[in-house]
Curated annotation (Swiss-Prot):
Cystine pairings recorded for this chain: none
Record-linked InterPro entries: aa-tRNA-synth_II/BPL/LPL (IPR045864), Ala-tRNA-lgiase_IIc (IPR002318), Ala-tRNA-ligase_IIc_anticod-bd (IPR018162), Ala-tRNA-synth_IIc_core (IPR018165), Ala-tRNA-synth_IIc_N (IPR018164), Ala-tRNA_ligase (IPR050058), Ala_tRNA_ligase_euk/bac (IPR023033), DHHA1_dom (IPR003156)
Family designation: Belongs to the class-II aminoacyl-tRNA synthetase family.
Location within or outside the cell: Cytoplasm
Species, as recorded: Yersinia pseudotuberculosis serotype O:3 (strain YPIII)
GO terms classed as biological process: alanyl-tRNA aminoacylation; negative regulation of DNA-templated transcription
Name of the coding gene: alaS
Entry protein name: Alanine--tRNA ligase
């Protein structure tokens, strides 16, 4: 009996756990240690710093089932998804890793045992082929002599990508750094499927499918191309869960495995599709996985960076739903079936289900408004096309006006055997980006160029003053040996009490001083394992290896501490009042206020805001100790500690506890007791994106200052209404009631005035070819009264064409009324359009009533004078 996808995932982890590997949870799809990476796209991403020697773990062997997304950037499978058997935007990468522990012998034997042992995957040995790098005799001999793979099924692959070490079987992290040969394992589906072995002319066929890649990191590539042996070689492996599931379930397409069969059935159910072989069903089944997990990991649809890639995937899925005949929003309805088929791998997604569904529903509703119009425009453009390529300007207009990502446009074109001029599209996009850059006025960010190899010891939990040594200096992003008075720079110390911005908490400010120099620190940032003090040297000269006294601005730090502790209380209070679906999605903690973003699908009600505020203040009054404890990450999770969105955690984590109310992982600085916070007041509650709410609040001195401001404001209002704070509501209510009464009386007077004006105007109507025409410019008449006057004049004149105008604030207001018996010859909308264009405006309306505005007051008399001739020509 074949294994389910969930059973295969668990079996892989169980196997390597039995071989002494630490089972490590999947990291977020948003990489937290690699700004060059759009999404997590391989199992090794979360261990990159370990392989680079910048991070250490408590274990030397690890195994994971890593969520991955490949859409956008270098790794972009989007256009192929749904059209091939194995392309996905989202997949799970099974992997085992050795950090200087075992190497080729164990890595190869582990893989072979898992794949072929009766206890595990029990694949036929004769169905497995392997490749090695051309000069990797060690790996070749292990496969041939120890494992026993016949020589004819071991293929050496050389440099087949146009350069030294540029090979399918040589892995490189970058132009420099760790690299090494790799060995890939292929499964032979049999001669009933076209394709040849790897390295052959037919290797792109579907007969021989790569199921596992084993990378042997044994070299450190230098900038001159030299390969130096690593002192501790490592292993990084990756096996696509969906691919191995297809093999073990005896199917040839990933979309035929149990997980996708169930998802495709769910897609058919919510869209009403009946043809289960439709490629659109595959597209949607794939896309709900990437979209749901990306949103769960904190990505929100937008027009830039990760948010734009997410929006592209969502909109591609919606378009395919449209092709299937979906008549209403459907995509969000697939989150629940996805959670069901993913099982334990969707535990975090399940906690965020309501928020994810709301984000998807909102995005679909927004796109539905422009989808049909955009498709109609695209159909029209394609019908006029003489060649086989849609121009880039049209593709850009579809993007800019109708929200069509270029790959969606390309999808539609591909279905008609047409192409898109993507180079032309990029030119139009770049022109728009250039305009945006020019209007923004932003300059270069030199700090983003800084790379620091050394580490800084942070002492700020216990100290606000520290003796330290300068280990590095950076000016305009470049390392220098010294800086001089007046120069802006970044100073790195061997140890520091300054907190580097992270976890939503801003960096510290203060001074670095010695006998001859003073450096004013205006911000503190992290650069890898180093802490950089950003600022300006106000006096003297500062050199590398100089000693300094690091002095944190204590008053500012204390205010930040209170605000940070309050965010923890706020988070717990929100979960208590709104529900456990609430999760932190971002924060800002500075010395003035705190800002907290969280997942919730609707605006908070006033009574909920009051409950949250009261609950936080109750915990402040309890004056609970704020305690920290360092423990294993898994132990912290078992304790119920909540993790901060988007933050990277080591194996040893700092757990912050506030009595029995709040337990979170946090590396920030905090109050000693909750009572130190003093007072908590919410300023605003608002929405930032679909499914994301934001609270801004103040604490301590800031909260008291707010109370004073509000009290002063109440006193001012009380003085204005001649009352006091105790009867203020009654006094304001009385003022409002009197104001409404006076407004009604004023309106009655205006109506009477309009009636009198209308009565006097009716006598000035002219007969034009037997039709009454009344044209008048009125003074001291509000524009909104013109309509009432036209209605009165129609009643008085019986059959007539009426044109009234007035001016106010250098603007012209026009109205034309035509009685219904005359609209066959004169239409109000046509007449007013002619008048409006003469006064620099435009307008329109019904045949019997139309309004317009203009900006050229001086042209109004001539424009009104032209009406008589215009009407006469039509009568």
């Amino acid at each position: 009996m074949s294994k389910s996808t969930a059973e295969i995932r668990q079996a892989f982890l169980d196997f390597f756990h039995s071989k002494g590997h630490q089972v490590v949870s999947s990291s977020s799809l948003v990489p937290n240690n690699d700004p060059t990476l759009l999404f997590t796209n391989a199992g090794m991403n979360q261990f990159k710093d370990v392989f680079l020697g910048l991070d250490k773990r408590a274990y030397s062997r690890a195994t994971t089932s890593q969520r991955c997304v490949r859409a956008g950037g270098k790794h972009n499978d989007l256009e192929n998804v749904g059209y091939t058997a194995r392309h996905h935007t989202f997949f799970e990468m099974l992997g085992n890793f050795s950090f200087g522990d075992y190497f080729k012998h164990d890595a190869i034997n582990f893989a072979w045992e898992l794949l072929t042992s009766e206890q595990w995957f029990n694949l036929p040995k004769e169905k497995l082929w392997v490749t090695v790098y051309e000069t990797d005799d060690e790996a070749y001999n292990i496969w041939a002599n120890e494992v026993g793979v016949p020589h004819e099924r071991i293929i050496r692959i050389g440099d087949n990508k146009g350069g030294a070490f540029a090979s399918d079987n040589f892995w490189q992290m970058g132009d420099t750094g760790p690299c090494g040969p790799c060995s890939e394992i292929f499964f032979d589906h049999g001669d009933h499927i076209w394709g040849g072995p790897p390295g052959s002319a037919e290797e792109d066929g579907d007969r021989y499918i790569e199921i596992w890649n084993i990378v042997f990191m044994q070299f450190n590539r230098q900038s001159d191309g030299t390969m130096l042996p690593l002192p501790k070689p490592s292993v990084d492996t990756g096996m696509g869960l969906e691919r191995i599931a297809a093999v073990l379930q005896h199917v040839n397409s990933n979309y035929e495995i149990d997980l996708f069969r169930d998802l495709i059935a769910a897609v058919a159910d919510v869209t009403g599709a009946t043809d289960l072989s439709s490629k659109s069903l595959r597209v949607i089944a794939d896309h709900i996985r990437s979209c749901a997990f990306l949103i769960s990991d904190g990505v929100i649809p937008s027009n830039e960076n990760r948010g734009y890639v997410l929006r592209r995937i969502i909109r591609r899925a919606i378009r395919h739903g449209n092709m299937l005949g979906a008549k209403e929003t459907f995509f969000y309805k697939l989150v629940a079936p996805l959670i069901a088929v993913m099982g334990p791998a969707a535990a975090e997604l399940k906690q965020q289900q309501a928020m994810v569904e709301q984000v998807l529903k909102t995005e679909e509703e927004q796109f539905a408004r422009t989808l049909e119009r955009g498709l109609a425009l695209l159909d029209d453009e394609l019908s006029k096309l003489t060649g086989d390529t849609l121009d880039g300007e049209t593709a850009f207009r579809l993007y800019d006006t109708y929200g069509f990502p270029v790959d969606l446009t390309a999808d539609v074109c591909r279905e008609r055997n047409l192409k898109v001029d993507e180079a032309g599209f990029e030119q139009a996009m770049e022109a728009q980006r250039r305009r945006a850059r020019e209007s923004s006025g932003f300059g270069a960010d030199y700090n983003s160029l800084i790379r620091v190899d050394s580490a800084s010891q942070f002492s700020g939990y216990d100290h606000v003053q520290q003796h330290a040594t300068v280990t590095a200096l950076f000016r305009n992003g470049e390392a220098v040996d010294e800086i001089h008075a007046g120069e802006e720079a970044v100073v790195v110390l061997n140890r520091t009490p300054f907190y580097g911005e992270s976890g939503g908490q801003v960096g510290d400010k203060g001074e670095l001083k010695n006998a001859t120099a003073t450096f004013s620190v205006t911000d503190t940032q992290k650069y890898g394992q180093a802490i950089g003090h950003v600022g300006i040297l106000t006096t003297g000269t500062l050199r590398v290896n100089h000693s300094v006294e690091a002095l944190v601005d204590v008053v500012r730090r204390n205010r930040i501490r209170l605000n940070h502790s309050a965010t923890h209380l706020l988070h717990a209070a929100l979960r208590n009042v709104l529900g456990e679906h609430v999760a932190q999605k971002g924060s800002l903690v500075n010395d003035k206020y705190l800002r907290f973003d969280f997942s919730h699908f609707e605006a908070m009600k006033p009574e909920q805001i009051r409950l949250v505020e009261d609950l936080v203040n109750e915990q402040i009054r309890r004056n609970m100790p704020v305690q920290t404890e360092v423990m294993e990450l898994d132990a912290a999770k078992e304790k119920g500690a909540m993790a901060l969105f988007g933050e990277k955690y080591d194996d040893q984590v700092r757990v912050l506890t506030m009595g029995d109310f709040s337990t979170e992982l946090c590396g920030g600085t905090h109050a000693s007791r909750t009572g130190d916070i003093g007072l908590f007041r919410i300023l605003t509650e608002s929405g930032t994106a679909a499914g994301i709410r934001r609270i801004e609040a103040v604490t301590g001195e800031g909260a008291i200052a707010l109370l004073h401001q509000q009290s002063d404001l109440l006193q001012d209002v009380a003085h204005l209404v001649k009352g006091d704070i105790h009867n203020l509501a009654d006094k304001v209510r009385a003022v409002l009631d009197r104001s409404k009464m006076l407004e009604r009386e004023l309106q009655q007077l205006k109506d009477q005035q309009a009636a009198q004006e209308s009565a006097s105007l009716s006598s000035s109507a002219k007969l034009i070819n037997g039709v009454k025409l009344l044209v008048s410019q009125l003074d001291n008449v509000e524009p909104k009264m013109l309509r009432t006057m036209v209605d009165d004049l129609k009643n008085q004149l019986g059959s007539a064409i009426i044109v009234l105008a007035t001016t106010a604030d250098d603007k012209v207001s026009l109205i034309v009324g035509v009685t219904k018996d005359l609209t066959g010859k004169v239409k109000a909308g046509e007449l007013i359009a002619d008048i409006a264009q003469q006064v620099g405006g435009k307008g329109g309306g019904r045949p019997d009533m139309a309004q317009a505005g203009g900006t050229d007051v001086q042209a109004l008399p001539a424009a009104l004078a032209s009406v008589e001739a215009w009407v006469a020509s039509r009568m």
